[in-house]
Amino acid sequence: MNLRNFFVLLFLFFLSDYAAAQSVVLNGDFKKIDAASKLPVAWDNFMGDKANYDFKLDSAGGQNGKPALIIASKTTDGNFGAYDCVIPYTFKGHEIKLKGYLKTENVTGYAGFWLRIDGTASFNNMQDQNIHGTTDWKEYTITLPYDDKNAVNINAGALLSGKGKIWFSDVQVYIDDTPVEKLKPKTPELFNAQKDMAFSQGTGMVDFVPTDQQIKNLALLCQVWGFIKYHLPKVAAGDVNMDAELFRVMPSVIKAKNYAEASAAIEQWVDKLGKPAVCSICKPFDEKDVAQKPDYGEIFDRSVVSASLADKLNFILHNNDNRQNYYIAMAQVGNPDFSHELPYKEMLYPDAGYRLLALFRYWNMIQYFFPDKYLIGEDWSNVLPRLIPKFLAAKNAMEYDVAAMEMIASVHDTHANIWSAAQGLSDYRGKYAPPFQAKFIENKLVVTAYYNDTLGVKDNLRIGDIITAINGAKVEEMVKKFLPLTAASNYETQLRDMPREYLLRSGNADFEFDVLRDGKPLQVKQTGIAQTKLNYLAAADPHHNEPGYHLMDNQIGYVYPGRYHNKDLPAIKELFKDTKGIIVDMRCYPSEFMPFTFVPYIKNGEAKFVKFTSGSIYYPGLFREGQELYVKPDNKYKGKVVVIVNEESQSQAEYTTMAFQSSTNVTVIGSTTAGADGNVSAIVLPGGISTMISGLGVLYPDGTVTQRKGVRIDEVVKPTIAGIKAGKDEPLERAEAIILGK
């Protein structure tokens, strides 16, 4: 539900390299400066939305005039920015502690230090301390258990979630109260999978144009390889590097002239991995509460695979008792944690073998651990023959990133995008953008706001102008072109993201627009600026410095969750006590979690509001429904409540809306929401590509899904072009009318 929190988790992924030097460098006083980066040594690794945050050193801005590092938001669209100091060693001990000083300014989300111990479940990002707004220097401490048998790296840093600015300084990390810089690292105990480095420098596979049979062979290999990865006990124990095993078997499968030869090559490989012992306690899964059953594709289809291979795979299926798996774990709430996957981030343009690994890895994660696979809209197996040739044909980093983007977009999940700074994809989109906002209104691309008052943009383009062509390309043709590359759950959300990601981007700063203004065609030239310099905040939330609640005409309470804080709830209750109703403007991402704080204040009735589906390590591909959740009503507020939603309402906003809907006095108006709810799971792919998926299925108590469809809407209300030109907020006006009974 909390998308921002999981964005924060997304980039703090497993790092498996061990440095040769034995001296621990934390440099928490920031005094040792790297000559190239001009940043403190060991503190030049950034995570999160790098384009939307500034990372700087203030040489005297810290506690008592000491050096401090800064994270500052540049736009309203950033989810989080973080510094990551990696200590690539393990130590003897039982407790780890991070201490440091932190100061904040106008933080809308939350800020804090973070600490993660790779190889274990130990993680804390101080979200529960709810540090936001403006705060003076204060020392903070994170204390976690330290499992020296399984710990790999220590990742320490500071983060800013949402908008604002933070300073931090005087960072120290202790093991059993001894600074790590005074400790001697212990020799790490590696899994056998980590010791197999045979292909760490590349596969040596040359590019080739696959025949139809080679595509079929590779598709079959992908399915068997993933099945083995998530079912064979030897793999689950961490004894097999499945990336390396793919590269070992792939050449013989590519050479196979037909399915029979491909089956023989795959069977020989399976035999080398070993047969599992007979499992006397293994049994078929219970059919109770099953939301989605495992799908094994073609691997048991005897018109595709040989009988002997099918029998061996069937034996593995029914003789594994994997309660844990080296490559997959389940978070406490039930979403998948794809452990021990290597990002190979130094391979910006991976060779053909690693490009296929990216496809195979992602395909099997979706096949076995995506709760909404049945909502994708096509047979997931059909993706392989379509994308195998594209991944093989990618001639450079740009084409590889674009192929990966098409793959990721094919699951139709608004959480699924390329969230890392993929330079190839950035080059494809173009670094320049015009300094105005445009949205699809009444199926037309309409100028709706200005990001920057620069380069004569307000003279060239007016609010309400309809853009029909960009640099000679018709908008409707551009939409068709970029739909397969726009990762979103539904068409409305694809149109939400497409202007910023593709339509209003170019490698050239000179833009030419065909425009309809009051029905008259015009051609307008507009110079663009670097996309990273656009002030998205000015358009997305013009009132970002104001409180998240106020009175409207002394009759209606208004709450904007993007600026709401739970500490304000007592003041809100007092201010709203005599109002006729409350408008909750959910066309944003909530800055704090509201379902069990604000919702009880307005709720009446006993209705439950949500249930989840989650996956299984023991039965990969199986998803079960969990128990329904309930918000206990305070029943303090007696007026009407109207929640406004649109395509900007995503993840936590959708979950919060569902909680509101469990109250009988709530009406939801607006338009289709983003259709991406549930805790997210991070995925890394070769080339350092970072993405994620919705890791839990989210349903109303009656079983109605929200993925792709969005939340239920009682009354559809959309902006019009005429309303945009007149400066009206038509959904807000309708919400007022509902409360006042007009």
Which sequence ranges carry the predicted segments?
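PDZ/PDZ-like domain segments forming the peptide/carboxylate-binding groove
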Residues: 213-214, 219-222, 226-227, 294-331, ...
